[in-house]
Curated annotation (Swiss-Prot):
Name assigned to this protein: Snaclec rhodocetin subunit alpha
Subunit relationships: Heterotetramer of subunit alpha, beta, gamma and delta; only the gamma and the delta subunits are disulfide-linked. Alpha-beta heterodimer and gamma-delta heterodimer associate orthogonally, giving a cruciform conformation. This heterotetramer may covalently dimerizes thanks to the gamma subunit.
Species assigned in the record: Calloselasma rhodostoma (Malayan pit viper)
Location relative to the cell: Secreted
Pfam families in alphabetical order: Lectin_C
Disulfide bridge positions per record: 2-13, 30-127, 102-119
Length: 133
């Protein structure tokens, strides 16, 4: 089972945090909460819907943007999209074009789109970790 304050679905635990942080601060904060925790990643549309629902329930629908664990990592000439927890990018809900390196969920309408934002911007966020098997 997930620790107190965390929501679960399948084998993962999720928890939104209301304190606004930069992307790096939020990622570091997640890793300090639970072993193996990171900013939230989403592997499919169903998980994205669940994440949005948990965020909206916790923020009484007054939330517009929240950090997710997606980031553009520059590797020499190539730029790679990577989840901070290392999970594969099997599902994307990107709103192009992207100008910045860090991604957030824009919760304004329907299924939230993922936008890039200045990594130094401070936003609320959600952490996620996988339960040991």
């Amino acid at each position: 089972d997930c620790p107190d304050g965390w929501s679960s679905t399948k084998s993962y635990c999720y928890r939104p945090f209301k304190e606004k942080k930069t992307w790096e601060e939020a990622e570091r904060f997640c890793t300090e909460q639970e072993k193996e925790a990171h900013l939230v990643s989403m592997e499919n549309r169903l998980e994205a819907v669940f994440v949005d629902m948990v965020m909206e329930n916790n923020f009484e629908n007054k939330i517009y943007r929240s950090w997710i664990g997606l980031k553009i990592e520059n590797k020499g000439q190539r730029s790679n999209l990577e989840w901070s927890d290392g999970s594969s990018i099997s599902y994307e809900n990107l709103y192009e074009p992207y100008m910045e390196k860090c991604f957030l969920m824009d919760h304004q309408s329907g299924l939230p789109k993922w936008h890039t934002a200045d990594c130094e911007e401070k936003n609320v966020f959600m952490c996620k970790f996988q339960l040991p098997r």
